[in-house]
Amino acid sequence: VSGAFEHTINMQFKGQFMRAFVLQGATPQIVLGINPKTMPNFKTIADLKGKKVGVSAPGSSTNVMVNFLLAKVGLKPSDVSIIGVGTGNGAVAAMRSGQIDAMSNLDPVITLLLRSGDLKIASDTRVIAESEKVFGGPMPAGCLYAPQTFIDKNPNTVQALTNAMVRANKWIQAAGAADIIKAVPEGYLLGDRAVYIDAFLAAKGSLSPDGMIPEKGPQSAFKALASVDEKLAVAKLDLTAVYTN
C-alpha cells in the first residue's frame, strides 16, 4: 500500500501487523491557514478560540494538527468548532464564502486559496523544521507498507519496490517544474498547471530525499494518533515493528 505511515500503528492496534519499508513524504504537508476576511486581525493560534476551523474530516490528520497547535497555546480541541470540508472544491468554497474562520488542509486547496488571497498561512508542515516543531519530532507521512507476512514471503519484491521508490525520490529532488509537468499525467494537474507547479515547489522540501524512515518517527506518529483516540493512547504497542529501513 502507498499510504500514511500512521496506518501501520493503527493496524497494529487492531491486531494486524503492517510494516513500512520506504518513505515518500518526510512531513504530513498539512497547512493551517487563516481566513483573512473573517479574521483580519489574527495574530496567534490563541485567536482561534471560539472560531470555526475546517478540516478534511473530523479525526483525520488535518484535525490532529489543529489539536497539537491548540495545545501549544493552552487550548483544548473543544475550544474551537471543527467542521469537515473535504480536500477539494468544497473546502475552497467554505473558505471563500466565510463559512469557516481557518482551515487545516492540503494542496492543491492551500495553493489555490493562497493565490487568490483567500488564505494566510499560520503553520506550514510542508517545511520540515515547522513540522518537527508542531509534532515534537520527525513525522513521517506517505510511505509504502505491507503486511509483515507479505514482506517475509516476498523479500525480493519488497526490495525492488524500495529501490524504485528511492530512485523516484532522488529524481524528484533533482527535477525542475518542466520535468515534473512532462512526467505527471494530465489528469493530475487539476486543469491548472501553474497551481500544480506552485504546490509541488512548496512541498518539494518535505519529500524524502532517500526513503529512510527516521528512528523517532513512530513515536511522533503514535503521539499524534493518541491525541484523537483515547483507547489507542493507553495501548501497549511495539513501535519498532511498524517500520524497517
Question: What residue ranges belong to the model's regions?
Answer:
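Short, glycine-/small- and polar/acidic-enriched structural segments
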Residues: 1-87, 97-107, 111-112, 118, ...
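Secondary-structure end/capping motifs
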Residues: 151-233
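Hinge/cleft segment of the Venus flytrap/periplasmic-binding protein
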Residues: 234-245
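A generic alpha-helix surface/boundary motif
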Residues: 5, 64, 144-145, 178-179, ...
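Pocket-lining segment of extracytoplasmic ligand-binding domains
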Residues: 90-93, 97-186
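Short helix-capping segments at alpha-helix termini
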Residues: 72-78, 192, 232-234
